[in-house]
């Protein structure tokens, strides 16, 4: 009789894979390289992920999902100060060494999705999720929806660009100072209550 599948094994493997990939490229992903790095059989990956394409898709979903807790905050209920604190938490999370490593993987995945013509790719959709998140707060605070969407896009592009800057330049302080200013400009669009 076959052994019952362990529902915790796949998420555990994904966590180990993400840690392994922090200093590597998605292009290096194969069942063999991961099996060697993690000390398991290639069969384990075939069993849990099926094929390389599904494995990479699961990795990308896990990378993008790292921000789910931040994106589920009900920002429409926050005042300026609380929203500023929320955005400070966002920067804290994304600017850690792990956050920068995972953002680099997300950027790589988004570029691969672009080249493959995947308009609805998981990584490509990450920016839109952030734009909607920020626009929700602006709209809830009397900024007209069209204006809120544009302001949110400007802010999120700054967020992603500053993360890229911190990764490439290695100067997290400079990126943090610019992010703080971007938050102040965004929040100032909403009058004090």
Where are these regions (language model features)?
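Hydrophobic alpha-helical connector segments
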Residues: 58, 71-103, 151-155
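N-terminal intrinsically disordered/low-complexity leader segments
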Residues: 1-8, 193
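Amphipathic alpha-helical packing segments from all-alpha helical-bundle domains
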Residues: 68-74, 97-107, 115-142, 153, ...
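Amphipathic C-terminal alpha-helical segment
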Residues: 96, 112, 156-173, 186-193
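Helix-turn-helix
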Residues: 12, 16, 20-58
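Short, basic, alpha-helical segments at the C-terminal edge of helix-turn-helix-like DNA-binding modules
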Residues: 61-68
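Short loop-to-helix capping motifs
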Residues: 24, 112-117
